[in-house]
């Protein structure tokens, strides 16, 4: 059971139903993934994955799916993962790109890009057209970012290693 400091409880009780917040905080996060439409279609990938597990759509992301049963196989070991057809991504992480709705030809700056879940999602939404700057301020995180960009076939992205203040006035 989670223990919250009183100051935290006081603060968040003003913003939300704290009992509901606490209940959801104690729940196990459901495993989820997103189909990478740069490399495959949603229907083709769903069909390929049916032999491993059942999926349920993520309501706010048409390429996102919850995995109903992961006990039989490690998703990161699947051929579909290695080929970049899917990206293991928490469903909550699919929300920002879905709200931003980047389009082909747009110019997008991702300030905290590693390991690349939202970056690869935006690149797919942009159909690899336009420019996506994938920035992170920690050198050791760029390796996973670069690896994921390559695995997912992202071609419209430049990676940078800067603190956020470097981009002040960036437009």
Where are these regions (language model features)?
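S-adenosylmethionine
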Residues: 1-171
């Amino acid at each position: 059971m989670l223990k919250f400091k009183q100051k935290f409880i006081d603060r968040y009780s003003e913003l939300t139903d704290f009992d509901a917040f606490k209940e959801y905080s104690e729940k196990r996060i459901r495993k989820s993934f997103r189909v990478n439409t740069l490399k495959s279609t949603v229907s083709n990938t769903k069909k390929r994955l049916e032999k491993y597990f059942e999926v349920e759509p993520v309501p706010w992301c048409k390429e996102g799916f919850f995995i109903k049963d992961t006990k039989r196989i490690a998703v990161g070991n699947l051929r579909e993962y290695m080929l970049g057809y899917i990206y293991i991504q928490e469903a909550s992480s699919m929300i920002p790109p879905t709200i931003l709705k980047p389009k082909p030809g747009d110019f997008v700056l991702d300030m905290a890009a590693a390991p690349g879940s939202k970056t690869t999602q935006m690149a797919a939404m942009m159909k690899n057209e336009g420019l996506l700057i994938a920035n992170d301020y920690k050198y050791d995180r760029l390796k996973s970012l670069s690896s994921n960009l390559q695995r997912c076939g992202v071609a419209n992205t430049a990676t940078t290693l800067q603190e956020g203040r470097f981009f002040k006035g960036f437009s």
